[in-house]
Swiss-Prot record:
GO CC terms, sorted: cytosolic large ribosomal subunit
Designated name of the protein: Large ribosomal subunit protein uL30
Record keywords, A-Z: Ribonucleoprotein, Ribosomal protein
Keyword Transcription: no
Assembly and oligomerization: Part of the 50S ribosomal subunit.
Transmembrane segments: none
Family: Belongs to the universal ribosomal protein uL30 family.
KW Ribonucleoprotein (keyword) present: yes
CDD domains, A to Z: Ribosomal_L30
Entries under PANTHER family matching the protein: LARGE RIBOSOMAL SUBUNIT PROTEIN UL30M, MITOCHONDRIAL RIBOSOMAL PROTEIN L30
Amino acid sequence: MAENGKTVQVTQIASVIGRKPGQAETITGLGLRGIGSTRTLEDTPAVRGMIRKVAHLIKVEG
């Protein structure tokens, strides 16, 4: 868990087909495997940066 104990839930809502390679790699780095895939991640600056990079492809809760 994160030091502050907070988590964030991310869900992929759009495909990475036709996107820049860096965006596809970021989605994979978040642990998402396809549309509808959901992961609960630690709320860290690194994760927040990845979320910002692909915000148009995911839905964030928490």
